[in-house]
Regions:
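ATP/NTP phosphate-donor binding region
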Residues: 1-91, 347
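Glycine/threonine-rich beta-strand-loop-alpha-helix active-site module
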Residues: 75-183
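Carboxylate- and glycine-rich phosphate/diphosphate-binding segment that chelates Mg2+/Mn2+
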Residues: 154-262
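Short alpha-helical scaffolding segments that buttress acidic/His motifs in well-ordered protein cores
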Residues: 201-205, 248-256, 270, 291, ...
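Flexible, glycine/charged-enriched surface loops at secondary-structure junctions
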Residues: 211-220, 235-247, 262-267, 281-284, ...
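C-terminal catalytic subdomain
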Residues: 262-329, 334
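C-terminal charged capping/lid subdomain of soluble metabolic enzymes
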Residues: 306, 313, 317-393
């Protein structure tokens, strides 16, 4: 029986060159905390100067917060929130990859509410409080095609002292405005292009398998899987094509919409445990490492849906039995991972040991248990351990 809720309040301005509209579109405030990464890429590429100039053109004052790490951490969220309050900022603008925009959302919530951001986390050691006020408005300007955070309310932050990487979001953390300009993505290096692109792929594939899915998320998920399968290898080989970058930017946004209308599943929970304990591990890389044994399990129990994904990726399944049709997804995934140069990734290269696996499995279920609830397979702790063991090298 068809039963769903469709809610998507974000205004999305999409297209090459459309960043210029930041200088004239209506903004949700008059003073922005501009959140960027600590790595300096937004300054080196000139993206920050361009955004600051456009905001000034629009009569908006700015304060810069530039401490965000690839796996963003609680201390910086609380620090950014304190700065926003002290400077009287009335909205937060995230410029950069998913980590930066996620941080902007968390800072926006913490700036509007008392205490620590972690007081409002609903699992693990979180305080499980309800926010007293909605988050400050958020503007998202992504410079990578990966998380799709410009099209969903979710934010993922790590508490370092407890090795917990936990998601949060409500209606107030949907961006009020997102500007997706593929021109900002042309400078992204091949390895980052590959890892962020695979993150977008898994958002879409997981949303298609999730028990929270709905008709609109299915359509968007298959669109994203098709585009990423076709264009991500091209972008890794030559990232200068604006047309290719545009297709990937749309795929990432479409996958982000899937996260709003459906949900990721426990594949993401397993990865969050990995990168919570090993923050140098890029999120997309961790997902790739876990993906083949994880989706092999999904294919055994959800062969029809996995077969749909395989066909969308270009696999010929005609004449196969249903079980083999489902497992064709694993074949297609292995090909895509190799095509984007990520088939050599190893957990051990990031300091992960086999001895950690039971603790990682527990962490995944304790901190991101909500995604297990929408996974179409009942993955108990022994099954999670088995996936980690098979993925380990």
């Amino acid at each position: 029986m068809l039963d769903f809720t469709f809610h998507m309040p974000t205004r999305i301005i999409f297209g090459a060159g459309r960043l210029a509209e930041l200088g004239r579109t209506r903004l949700p405030g008059r003073k922005a905390l501009v959140v960027i990464s600590a790595g300096g890429s937004m300054r080196r590429t000139g993206h920050l100067d361009k955004v600051l100039a456009l905001l000034a053109q629009n009569g908006c004052a700015t304060v810069i917060f530039d401490k965000i790490q690839p796996n963003p951490v609680l201390i910086h969220v609380n620090e950014g929130a304190a700065l926003a309050r002290a400077e009287g900022c009335d909205f937060v603008l995230g410029l950069g990859g998913g980590s930066t925009i996620d941080s902007a959302k968390s800072i926006a919530l913490a700036a509007a509410n008392p205490g620590s951001y972690w007081d409002y986390i609903q699992s693990g050691t979180g305080g499980r409080k309800r926010p007293e006020r909605p988050a400050l408005p958020v503007v998202a300007i992504p410079t990578t095609a990966g998380t799709g955070t410009e099209a969903d309310p979710w934010t993922v932050i790590t508490r370092e002292d407890t090795n917990e990487k936990i998601g949060w979001g409500d209606d107030s953390t949907y961006p009020a405005l997102s500007i997706v300009d593929p021109m900002l993505m042309v400078s992204v290096p091949p390895a980052v292009t590959a890892m962020t692109g695979m993150d977008a792929f898994f958002h879409a594939a997981e949303a298609y398998l999730s028990t929270a899915r709905q008709p609109s998320s299915d359509l968007l998920a298959l669109e994203a899987v098709s585009l990423i399968s076709q264009f991500l290898p091209q972008a890794v080989k030559d990232g200068n094509s604006v047309q290719v970058r545009t297709m990937l930017a749309w795929a990432s946004t479409a996958a982000g919409l899937c996260e709003s209308l459906s949900s990721c599943i426990s594949h993401h929970s397993l990865e969050h445990a990995l990168s919570a304990h090993h923050p140098a591990l890029p999120h997309g890389a961790g997902l790739v490492m876990l993906s083949l044994p994880y989706f092999e399990v999904m294919a055994r129990f959800q062969p029809k849906r996995c077969a749909d994904l395989a066909v969308t990726m270009g696999e010929d399944i005609e004449g196969m039995e249903l079980r083999e049709q489902g497992l064709a997804l694993v074949t297609a995934l292995r090909k895509l991972i190799a095509a984007v140069g990520l088939d050599g990734l190893k957990m051990s290269d990031y300091g992960v040991t086999r001895e950690e696996i039971p603790a990682l499995a527990r962490n995944a279920r304790e901190t991101m248990g909500g995604l297990f609830a929408v996974t179409p397979v009942d993955l108990r702790e022994d099954a999670v351990i088995a996936i980690f063991e098979k993925a380990y090298r």
